[in-house]
Amino acid sequence: MPDMTSASSGTVLAFDFGKRRIGVAIGEHELRMAHPLTTIDQSMTRPRFEKIAELIEAWQPVLLVVGLSVHADGTEHEITRLCRRFARRLEGRFRIPVALADERYTTVIARSVLEEVGVTGKKQRPMLDQIAAQHILQTYFDLSHAAS
């Protein structure tokens, strides 16, 4: 997996991985601004990767960023292993560099953002994961810019 400064230009896709849903965000490395894109609402591996392949074909990213889920103290748990596996699969299938990014509290932040604009309860579900992916990607951009 590349370091935080491996890509300096081009489109970047970010993923908030979950067992049932994957949030996707998009951004341009030069602008360093992330936007929510879509949520892949599918728990089966094959349909997930078919949808991801469609996104990659459409957007031609130079880098993929996967949020790495860990406990608040930084220790790993079951989902951490699944996030790493998902990242390896992305890199292997699509031959695009993949960076891992800390995703602690992204869902909490996404929920808060949606509540601020009046989206509550079950209405959040379609947007929550893509907003979390947006936060993952924005944090990646901010940290990679600070490192350069």
UniProtKB/Swiss-Prot annotation:
Top-level class of the enzyme under EC nomenclature: hydrolase
Keyword field contains Signal: no
GO cellular component, one term: cytosol
EC nos: 3.1.-.-
GO-annotated biological processes: rRNA 5'-end processing
Location relative to the cell: Cytoplasm
Alphabetic keyword roster: Cytoplasm, Hydrolase, Nuclease, Ribosome biogenesis
Gene Ontology molecular functions: nuclease activity
InterPro entries the UniProt entry points to: RNaseH-like_sf (IPR012337), YqgF (IPR005227), YqgF/RNaseH-like_dom (IPR006641), YqgF/RNaseH-like_dom_sf (IPR037027)
Source superkingdom: Bacteria
Cited Gene3D superfamilies: YqgF/RNase H-like domain
First-listed, main subcellular location of the protein, grouped into a coarse class: cytoplasm
CDD domains xrefs: YqgF
Entry's family note: Belongs to the YqgF nuclease family.
HAMAP family linked to this entry: Nuclease_YqgF
NCBIfam families: RNAse_H_YqgF
Chain's role: Could be a nuclease involved in processing of the 5'-end of pre-16S rRNA.
Protein name, as recorded: Putative pre-16S rRNA nuclease
Species of provenance: Nitrosomonas europaea (strain ATCC 19718 / CIP 103999 / KCTC 2705 / NBRC 14298)
